[in-house]
Swiss-Prot record:
A GO CC annotation given for this chain: nucleoplasm
Subunit: Homodimer. The C-terminal section interacts with the C-terminal tail of OPRM1. Also interacts with SDIM1.
Subcellular localization, as worded in the UniProt entry: Cytoplasm; Cell membrane; Cytoplasm, Myofibril, Sarcomere, Z line
Coiled coil: none
Entries under InterPro entries matching the protein: DnaJ_C (IPR002939), DnaJ_domain (IPR001623), DnaJ_domain_CS (IPR018253), DnaJ_subfamily_B (IPR051339), HSP40/DnaJ_pept-bd (IPR008971), J_dom_sf (IPR036869)
Name the record gives this protein: DnaJ homolog subfamily B member 4
Designated gene of the protein: Dnajb4
């Protein structure tokens, strides 16, 4: 004789999906080992979970209604949709079913071990109706606020911010970064934890500006009483040996002598794509002077087919000493003001 899942949950065969949920909620709370210390509680808790797993699934329930437990587990119920025979085996962890039903956390942990108001202990708790009413909890597992109508929501932990350093070459071409994070995850029992590593993939788009944020929602540590934090990476430019960044423009500083600043010179200016641009400077280089090469900067974030400019600044090197004769020559040929 197979198991009577309807009898286990205390419902009849015509029960609706909502009836199944209510029955499981009631029986699971009644026989949960953290509350019920009787020797039979663990086995009853497991039976209730298995009954719910079957009756809450339309496919399993249909096969069970026609062929019973033996037919469900023995493959008498047709195919699995891929040409194979459908067979059901209970996974054996009623705590996983309980945690999934109540949203991944154990609602008992905040009140088990206490005596209830009015002198009742947990063994005498009333299960019919709303089983959470004695604890200030609503049917969906959220804490009740006596001064409000709706359930109060769990709060999310503050975001966890990480600085992500990228080179100008990576911003110029775009790249993929893979960041390994470690976080705590709740086990199916909703109480204990495990450590888990995860690789987060970040697609760095061409031209992204410093300060750009990449958010991975709810990838932080899991806790029973809060929503996991978002993991946020913030783009930070690495220091470059040749260039500085000015928005989508690239700034290159050319070092020249005083004679070159006054008499002119020829330069080879490096670019982000590895080339050198020949540049002839014929004007007198004055303080703060810049030369602009259009279209040789970084891609625009919103239109990566277009680029900013390459800006050339000049760092004029003055001599430490100069002879008296040279001073006299300069005095004769340079204007006084």
């Amino acid at each position: 004789m197979g198991k009577d899942y309807y009898h286990i949950l205390g419902i009849d065969k015509g029960a609706t999906d909502e009836d199944v949920k209510k029955a499981y909620r009631k029986q699971a709370l009644k026989f949960h080992p953290d509350k019920n210390k009787s020797p039979q509680a663990e086995e009853k808790f497991k039976e209730v979970a298995e009954a719910y797993e079957v009756l809450s699934d339309p496919k399993k329930r249909e096969i069970y209604d026609q062929f019973g437990e033996e037919g469900l587990k023995g493959g008498a119920g047709g195919t699995d949709g891929q040409g194979g025979t459908f067979r059901y085996t209970f996974h054996g962890d009623p705590h996983a079913t309980f945690a999934a039903f109540f949203g991944g956390s154990n609602p008992f942990e905040i009140f088990f071990g206490r005596r209830m108001g009015g002198g009742r202990d947990s063994e005498e708790m009333e299960i019919d109706g709303d089983p959470f009413s004695a604890f200030g909890f609503s049917m969906n597992g959220y804490p009740r606020d006596r001064n409000s109508v709706g359930p109060s929501r769990l709060k999310q932990d503050p975001p966890i911010i990480h600085e992500l350093k990228v080179s100008l070459e990576e911003i110029y071409s775009g790249c993929t970064k893979r960041m390994k994070i470690s976080r705590k995850r709740l086990n199916p029992d909703g109480r204990s934890y495990r450590s888990e590593d995860k690789i987060l993939t970040i697609e760095i788009k061409k031209g992204w500006k410093e300060g750009t944020k990449i958010t991975f929602p709810r990838e932080g540590d899991e806790t029973p009483n809060s929503i996991p934090a978002d993991i946020v990476f913030v783009i930070k430019d690495k220091e470059h040996p040749k260039f500085k960044r000015d928005g989508s423009n690239i700034v290159y500083t050319a070092k020249i002598s005083l004679r070159e600043a006054l008499c002119g010179c020829s330069l080879n200016v490096p670019t982000m794509d590895g080339r050198n641009l020949p540049m002839s400077v014929t004007d007198i280089v004055k303080p703060g002077m810049r030369r602009r090469v259009i279209g040789y900067g970084l891609p625009f974030p919103k239109n990566p087919d277009q680029r900013g400019d390459l800006l050339i600044e000049f760092d004029v090197s003055f001599p430490d000493v100069i002879s008296a004769a040279s001073k006299e020559i300069l005095r004769k040929h340079l204007p006084a003001s």
